[in-house]
């Protein structure tokens, strides 16, 4: 009996960091599964902000739980747990930011001031500091060099139609690789944001703004063109088109970004 109690305690000690990291996101998982809907044959999603607003206390409790994670605890996690945590934090606080003015808002950009954007607003209590959304994305995720994964651009969501879809579930450590791959393909499949016409490849402006992130050797890709070819199937590229892109023989143009709110009508 005593041995069993000790064994259970030891198992709990070994499992607690993982179980805490995963159970932490359960409220966010429930909110997303209820209030985010696929559109455009699944290539995008829209968000029922009115329903989110009705459950804002649940969202706030989740954000408070994220805020209790210390830098020491975070640093002890493997990087896939860290990255899932940071993506969820970014997306959840973005929804909270929208709810501060919804329904009297048509775009997240309306929440900025004349000399500052909504992404520079410091309202996020995370890892012992008050941060902005920019800080989460560009410092904690992109700036450390720890993750070096350009697919995060298809996971963090800026509450706009032009953004990659807000995933209908929380990011988790054990599913992160699968989720990032699926989100990348999902975005590239959306012909309203990425397509070929008249021997020109038209891409979302995301690829222009963060071009350098796609040149850092992810899966052997040292250029945007090489990254695109990795996901040739999602773009429905034939062999000739793939070769033209590899050889820089195809023009690439970047589409205007749609900043309208990704709200469910």
Regions found by a protein language model. Give the residues of each.
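Bacterial N-terminal signal peptides
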Residues: 5-14
């Amino acid at each position: 009996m005593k041995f069993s109690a000790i064994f259970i305690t030891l198992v709990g000690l070994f499992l607690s960091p993982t179980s805490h990291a995963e159970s932490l996101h359960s409220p966010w998982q429930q909110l997303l599964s209820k209030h985010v809907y696929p559109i455009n044959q699944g290539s995008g999603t829209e968000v029922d902000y009115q329903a989110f607003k009705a459950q804002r206390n649940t969202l706030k409790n989740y954000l408070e739980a994220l805020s209790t994670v210390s830098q020491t605890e975070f640093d002890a996690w493997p990087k896939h747990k860290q990255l899932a945590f940071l993506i969820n934090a970014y997306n959840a606080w973005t929804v909270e930011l929208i709810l501060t003015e919804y329904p009297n808002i048509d775009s997240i950009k309306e929440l900025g001031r004349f000399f500052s954007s909504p992404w520079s607003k410091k309202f996020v209590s995370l890892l012992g500091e008050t941060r902005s959304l920019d800080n989460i994305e560009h410092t904690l995720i992109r700036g450390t060099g720890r993750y070096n994964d350009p697919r995060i651009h298809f996971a963090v969501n800026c509450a706009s139609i032009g953004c990659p879809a807000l995933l209908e579930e929380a990011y988790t450590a054990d599913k992160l690789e699968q989720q990032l791959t699926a989100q990348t393909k999902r975005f590239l499949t959306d012909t309203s944001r990425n397509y070929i016409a008249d021997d020109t490849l038209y891409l979302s402006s995301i690829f222009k703004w963060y071009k350098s992130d796609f040149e850092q050797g992810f899966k052997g890709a040292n250029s945007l063109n090489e990254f695109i070819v990795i996901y040739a199937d999602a773009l429905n590229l034939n062999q000739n088109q793939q070769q033209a892109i590899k050889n820089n023989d195809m023009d690439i143009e970047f589409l205007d970004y749609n900043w309208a709110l990704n709200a469910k009508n």
